[in-house]
Amino acid sequence: MFLLLSNDDGYASAGMRALVEVMEGAVERLIVMAPESNCSGVSHALTLTRPLTVQTHGNAIYSVNGTPADCVRVAVGGYFDEVPDMVISGINCGANLGDDVLYSGTVAAAFEGRYLKFPALAISNVAHRPKHLADTAQIVLDLFSFFKKNPLTGATLLNINIPDLPRAEIRGIRVTRLGQCRQERPLEKMINPRQEECYWIGANKGGFLADEGSDFAAIEQGFVSITPLQFDVTHDDQLEAVKHWLEPMR
C-alpha cells in the first residue's frame, strides 16, 4: 500500500513527525509531501500565479513552497511514479471542528485527495500545544489498521479530531456532525517598528455550541470525533424559497 501524508503545519512539524513514526511500518510505501512552512488557515487555496518547487529532506520526505492543496495536487499529479492508495493529512496541532473546517488547510489537503478520487483522512489533536501526540498517533494507527482491513471507498473523507489525552483515557469513538462556532474574531490593531498600522485577526473567542451529536460535544465528553464530509454545500432547504423569491424577476 502507498500512503501519502500531508498537513498544513509544515513538513517538519511535531505532528507530522509523530505520524511518520507510527506509520512507517504499517505500509509498503510512505511518502510525506507537505508545505515548507506553516500554512494554517489557508483553506483550499491553490497556487496559480507562480511555479511550485519541491525540496527533498532525507528519505521520502518532500516539501513544497505552496499550500496544503498544492502539495497533494503535486504528489498525485505525476511527481511520483505511482499514485497513493490513501491520503492522510495531519496530525494538526489544534482542533478542526464545526464550521472552522472551512478555514482549515489540514482538512483542505484531505479534501484535495478526495477530490482526486482517493479516500482521505484529516487528523487533528485538539490542543495547540499537545502533550499526548504519541498517543494521538497510536490512535491514528489503530484507525488506519481498521480501515486497511475494511477499505474505504474513493468517495470517503473523514474529519477526525482526537482529545489531547492519554490513550487509556479516551472514552471511545463517536460519529458526529459538524457543530457550530460562535464567531467572534477580534481585529487587533498594532503599530509596527516602521510606525505603520497593522492588524492581527484574533483567535475565535466566541466558543461553540456543544449540541448532542456534534463534534464539539464528542470532544468535550472525551471521545474521538469522526465526521464524514462532502463537497456539496448547497442549502437544499432554501432552493424552493429562492425560486419563489425570484419569480418576479422572470
Swiss-Prot record:
GO terms assigned for molecular function: 3'-nucleotidase activity; 5'-nucleotidase activity; exopolyphosphatase activity; metal ion binding; nucleotide binding
EC number, UniProt record: 3.1.3.5
Keyword Hydrolase: yes
InterPro entries for the chain: SurE, SurE-like_Pase/nucleotidase, SurE-like_sf
Subcellular location: Cytoplasm
Sequence positions that bind a divalent metal cation: 8-9, 40, 92
Gene Ontology CC: one annotated term: cytoplasm
Cofactor(s), by name: a divalent metal cation
Keywords assigned: Cytoplasm, Hydrolase, Metal-binding, Nucleotide-binding
Domain of life: Bacteria
Catalytic activity: a ribonucleoside 5'-phosphate + H2O = a ribonucleoside + phosphate
Family annotation (Gene3D superfamilies): Survival protein SurE-like phosphatase/nucleotidase (3.40.1210.10)
Cofactor note: Binds 1 divalent metal cation per subunit.
Main location: cytoplasm
Classification via PANTHER family: 5'-NUCLEOTIDASE SURE, 5'_3'-NUCLEOTIDASE SURE
Protein's job: Nucleotidase that shows phosphatase activity on nucleoside 5'-monophosphates.
Family: Belongs to the SurE nucleotidase family.
Name this polypeptide is given: 5'-nucleotidase SurE
Organism: Dichelobacter nodosus (strain VCS1703A)
Lineage: Bacteria, Pseudomonadati, Pseudomonadota, Gammaproteobacteria, Cardiobacteriales
Gene: surE
